[in-house]
Design a protein with these regions (language model features):
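C-terminal helix/juxtamembrane-tail motif
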Residues: 2-4, 13, 468-483
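N-terminal membrane-proximal hinge/A-helix region immediately C-terminal to the signal-anchor transmembrane segment
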Residues: 2-121, 125, 140, 144-156, ...
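Classical protein tyrosine phosphatase
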Residues: 31, 81-83, 90-91, 189-191, ...
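Conserved cytochrome P450 K-helix E-x-x-R motif and the immediately C-terminal K′/meander segment
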Residues: 45-61, 65-67, 244, 248, ...
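Cytochrome P450 heme-thiolate monooxygenase catalytic core
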Residues: 99-107, 118, 141-294, 312
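Cytochrome P450 heme-thiolate "Cys pocket" and heme-binding signature region
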Residues: 132, 287, 368, 406-437, ...
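Cytochrome P450 heme-binding "Cys pocket" and the immediately downstream C-terminal segment
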Residues: 307-310, 430-468
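Conserved cytochrome P450 K-helix/beta-meander segment immediately N-terminal to the heme-binding cysteine loop
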Residues: 380-408
């Protein structure tokens, strides 16, 4: 009798809790507005079975129809899409909203509780430990790696320049960026540019593909369904290779890695475990190769389309480093590439490497006169903010000079231009990334002129917005060797 009463009371309490949680979210979400949905499915039918480019176009059309802040239901999952700079500022600038949204859970099998995916206390501790890694003195050492790997890259491009063929530069940049981040993060080389079909390189490609797949494939978003698919088995196989490689490096370089962390890295007064080191190294591996690949590739694409801008960048590079192509570029010289800096900023405005940032709302919150219900995933979209005429004049026109004036787009609209996120969870490696982009771009331009495809090979811009922004049809360019 007593047991029955306890069970009944427990069931009632659970029902009340679920009712308040779900129907409270329904109530506040209805006030936000968004496209009409269906019972149980919500808006999932908008996106089910759509390939990535169509998924992106559907999202773009929904933004145009629903405004700068609206809700989407993917089954029981509530997403609130934000392209309003004021709302983005309120969320990104506040230490209250540092928990990442559910989309980042797709990274956890590879990255564990690294800096990108961890929350609250662990994130604060990890951030404090890792920040010194990007001090400018250490960055100078990384620039040497950038230059060495860039030399290999321009050698790999030579056959393309000699034939004058049109080719997709994106996968080649990926291999170079992978070599850079492996040597920078682990102090070892995987020779991805030379051994592009090695087991490790294939595993990186496989795991990044699966992570990206889960961001747009509605059926694979949910762990129950994903665990039944062949992708789960493929993921496990790739992770065995990736974690095994990182663990072997840690074991062989334990002392060197400890010194790189000044020998004082602790969490709650204890040294980092091998697993914690692996999580941070793997986080660098993921964040450090895919994001820079996207940025460099779209930058090369724009330089090919705008020969006048390319010429100005080239002239600036030569004025700083001279005409001897064999001389390496140091950090001080990279910092003198002021016009190239403007071109990079304009590229990231139109093609942010990370097209969205996600945050989880842990309690009902009033933000910019909107009540965001607890449990909602907030998706902030810098891609669409960067192309919004309310925020940027003539936004589809590539004009680096918009960042040069005292009242530049970057300064007057700080949360309308957030390619590296902003606030307490901004990208810790942005100086590293910008230095790498400048180093590789300057090396390419010292050796080659970048040309667009022939007219009959031209394709309209089309994007895949996964964790990283990718071009649907690659980045086709041609090269001409400089005399």
């Amino acid at each position: 009798m007593i047991l029955g009463v306890c069970v009944a009371l427990g069931a009632i309490a659970l029902t009340v809790y679920l009712y308040r949680k779900f129907f409270g979210a329904l109530y506040y979400a209805a006030k936000i507005g968004g496209p009409p949905g269906y019972p149980l499915l919500g808006n999932a039918l908008l996106f089910i079975n759509k390939p990535p480019p169509e998924f992106f176009l559907t999202l773009q059309n929904t933004i145009q129809e629903s405004g700068k802040c609206f809700r989407l239901w993917l089954g029981p999952e509530l997403l609130i899409v934000v392209t309003d700079a004021k709302v983005a500022e309120a969320i990104l600038s506040s230490p209250k909203y540092i928990e990442k949204s559910g989309e980042y859970d797709f990274l956890r099998p590879w990255l564990g509780d690294g800096l990108l995916t961890s929350s609250n206390r662990k994130w604060f501790a990890n951030r404090k430990i890792i920040t010194p890694t990007f001090h400018f003195k250490i960055l100078e050492q990384f620039v040497e790696i950038f230059d060495q790997q860039s030399n290999i890259f321009v050698d790999q491009l030579l056959p393309k320049a000699e034939t004058g063929e049109c080719f997709d530069v994106f996968p080649l940049v990926t291999l170079c960026a992978l070599d850079v981040i492996c040597e920078s993060a682990m102090g070892t080389t995987v020779n991805a540019q030379i051994l592009s079909d090695s087991e490790y390189v294939r595993a990186v490609k496989e795991i990044t593909y699966i992570i990206h797949l889960r961001t747009y494939d509605v059926m694979n978003r949910y762990n129950v369904l994903f665990s039944l698919s062949s992708y789960r088995r493929r993921q496990d196989k790739a992770l065995k290779i990736l974690h095994g490689y990182t663990n072997s490096v840690i074991q062989s370089r334990r002392q060197a890695l400890a010194q790189r962390n000044s020998g004082k890295a602790t969490v709650d007064g204890r040294p980092l475990t091998d697993e914690e080191i692996r999580e941070e190294v793997d986080t660098f591996m993921f964040e450090g190769h895919d994001t820079t690949t996207s940025a460099i590739s779209f930058l090369l694409y724009r330089l090919a389309k705008h020969p006048d801008i390319q010429r100005k960048v080239y002239d600036e590079i030569i004025s700083v480093v001279g005409e001897d192509r064999t001389l390496p570029v140091n950090l001080s010289q990279l910092n003198e590439f002021h016009y190239l800096d403007l071109v990079i900023k304009e590229t990231l405005r139109m093609y942010p490497s990370v097209p969205f940032f996600g945050r989880k709302i842990t309690e009902n919150s009033e933000i910019a006169n909107i009540t965001f219900p607890a449990g909602a995933n907030i998706i902030i979209m810098p891609f669409f903010m960067g192309r919004d005429p309310d925020y940027f004049d003539d936004p589809l026109h590539f004009r680096p000079e918009r960042f040069a004036s005292e009242m530049s787009a970057e300064k007057s609209n700080p949360y309308r231009y957030v390619p590296f996120s902003a606030g307490p969870r901004n990208c810790i490696g942005q100086k590293f990334a910008l230095a790498e982009i400048k180093s590789l771009t300057s090396k390419i331009l010292r050796h080659y002129e970048i040309l667009p495809p022939q007219q009959d090979q031209h394709q309209e811009e089309s994007f895949i917005a996964e964790v990283i922004l990718r071009p649907t049809h690659g980045i086709p360019i041609r090269l001409q060797k400089r005399q």
